[in-house]
Amino acid sequence: MGGVFELFGEGQRFLQFSNLRAGNESDEGNAATKLDLTLATGNNSTLFDNLAGEDRTLQSARSAINLLTFQCFAPGGRIGVAKRNGKETAGKGSSNHAPCTPSSMVHTLMLGQNLLETIHQNLLTRESVTDSYGPNGWGIPAWELPVEKREDKTAVENSTLTHLGRLVPLSRAIRLNDGGFSIILANGLEYPIFPAFREATATVIKRKGELAILSASTNRSLWRQLAAVSVRRQADADATSGPLALNRLRPSAETNIWVGALVTDKAKIEDVVESTYSLPAGMFSEFGRASYERGVAYAEELEGGLIQSVKTYASALKVTSPAYNRARQQFWTRVEQHLSALFDLARNTDLAADLPNCPWGKAVQAAAFDAYDQSCPHQTPRQIEAYALGLRKLTFRPKNQQPTPLAHE
């Protein structure tokens, strides 16, 4: 059993396929740095990697981390064809996303005081796994039932359709050479994605009446989606929920979380987004989440008013390219400096009854005025007149309604 955690040597290896050979004898393989998504290989940018053209040998510890990360997050696209047990690997040169990448899915982890506590907080109970994946969803680690050939249905299903099997995926057929500087790389196992299988760290929401995975994007900050992330899964109820590990928590105080995603456009990695937050206990109650969501919606409403103001200003001056992007960036940058006031809405839901006059509402209004002021010059008489016209759009009318629970709960 100990050999399955070795990076090199004959036989079974850690997150690598045994009996894997290059597709043809002249194939020199890929650089091992291709497994490191932070380095310049393939479609990855060279912006932060000045050694892209040189042969590099990675330390074994880093290679192990790279293997696990790549098997979880490798984007789909064209890939090499290798031979295993004399047969070509699947896909005919194509590959799908690794299991943690589809839809740029948002992943959430509970954070403890140290690594051991963090691991413990993210473990799932058998009850939770059975509720989410069915009576056969627990499985066994992939190294205890290795996939020796594609036709081995039992081993393939264990690796791709069970909780323990998917924790160490084999989405790519990889074999490190003994020097650690090159690899054989081809398509591996196919991992069903949502709705056939949901990742334990993902969040399920309702979008246009249908269940979907919560996605990240580069133009929408993660804090704007925390109301969905903080929903606990209810057995025999609606499947919308945040990460399954939330079921084990009974928060009476702050809960620290890490939220992140690999943002992709087809086979291209666009960016990595991540943040850490300390969620008040109110975020795990219906009314607390509803208040928080109303606060986010209020900011988005004011963003819309800001854009209309910039449009009015630009129209008056006959500007062909209004400064929409600049205004948005200025607005959200200022808003994010006041997130503590937004979390206060979950702590004290009474504040959401009068959003424009609570600290969060006032901070958002000030951010909108500041962003408009910075994006629309007002020095000449014509500019001042246009500025005044746009300023009239920045009106904030209180909406006196009590917070209600989220519709997707």
Protein language model regions, located:
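Short Cys/His-rich metal-coordination motifs, predominantly Zn2+-binding knuckles/fingers
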Residues: 59-62
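Flanking scaffold residues of small Cys/His-coordinated metal-binding clusters
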Residues: 51-54
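Beta-strand elements of modular eukaryotic interaction domains
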Residues: 47-49
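Short functional micro-motifs and their immediate structural scaffolds
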Residues: 64-67
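Extended alpha-helical scaffolding segments
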Residues: 1-42, 69-409
